[in-house]
Each structure stands twice: as structure tokens, then as C-alpha cells.
Amino acid sequence: GNTVAAAMERFHSMVDRRAKREPLQHITGHAPFRYLDLKVGPGVFIPRPETELVVQEGIEWTTRHGMYRAKVVDLCAGSGAIGLAFATEVPGSEVWAVEKSERTAQWTRRNLDETTKRYPAIAGNYHLEIADATQMPTLNQLDGTIDIVLTNPPYVPLSDIPVQPE
């Protein structure tokens, strides 16, 4: 078919979605986060710029304390932004990501798959657990071995999600 007409149709569809306040990142399917390009869409929060500071502080803290093979827990992992950024920026670190929602964990897995294509060394060092971060048995096997816990849990009421500013 006519590629210009198809492109215009796609463009108008995207504009219509944006006019309905759908986040731009969900429309494009991508969200930049530090050095990563994460896949996002319905069912996962878009990583916020302030979350990049969580990663930066975690990297600086573990480095300052000589933890060059840090063991990290990323609670409420969502897209995987925090744990994947840490794993790719701190070689040798090991990350356990905890995500309660199976639907959201599908995005975590997609981003893990994409990230390991660029950073194959992290493949064995990133572990995704589908579990409730607030439950004591979650990650019991790691008791006493973790260097740092990083998290930016969801704090937006579900009723506010469709209209949150992007």
C-alpha cells in the first residue's frame, strides 16, 4: 500500500491517543532511563527522572563502601529500570528484582531480554522473583547477604493513573 498514507494514519492515531492523555512513552513503547531504552506500555509505570537519582545514589553508596560486586534487591521492580541500570553500570553486581504483578513482570522480562542483548554479562546476575515485597518469606534465602535495597514503589493511587501528567 501507500507508505505515506499508512504513515499518516499511524501518526494521526498516535496524536488521537495523546489527545486522550495516554502517556507518550506508552504510545511510542519506549522510555529512556539512564543508559537504557526500556520498553513500556499499559500495565507498567513509566520510570521517572527522579528514579535515576535512586540508582545514582545506590551506585555511589556501594562504591564508597568498596562493594564492587554488590548484591542488590530491587523491590517493586516494574519495568526493571532500577535493577537493570545498576546491573549494567556496576559490572559483577547481582540483582534480585521483586515484582508482585505478573502483568507488570512481563515488561520486566522484556526489558531484561533486550538489555542482555546489549550487556550479555548480566544474564546470570539478574534474578526476577514474582512475589510480594511486603511479605517476609520473599527472598528469605538471601537473609544477611544483601548489600543494598533500592526501590521506588508505586505511590500513585490507581484512580489517578490515567490522568497523571507525563
State the predicted function of each range.
Residues G1-W61:
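Conserved AdoMet
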Residues K39, A85, E99:
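Conserved beta-strand segments that form the floor/walls of ligand-binding pockets within enzyme
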Residues G41-P42, G78, N152:
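A secondary-structure boundary/capping signal
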Residues W61, H65-Y68, N140-G144:
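Glycine-rich phosphate-binding loop signature in dinucleotide/nucleotide-binding domains
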Residues Y68-G78:
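Conserved class I S-adenosyl-L-methionine
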Residues S79-G92:
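Conserved SAM-binding loop of SAM-dependent methyltransferases across substrates and taxa
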Residues G92-S93, V98-E166:
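S-adenosylmethionine
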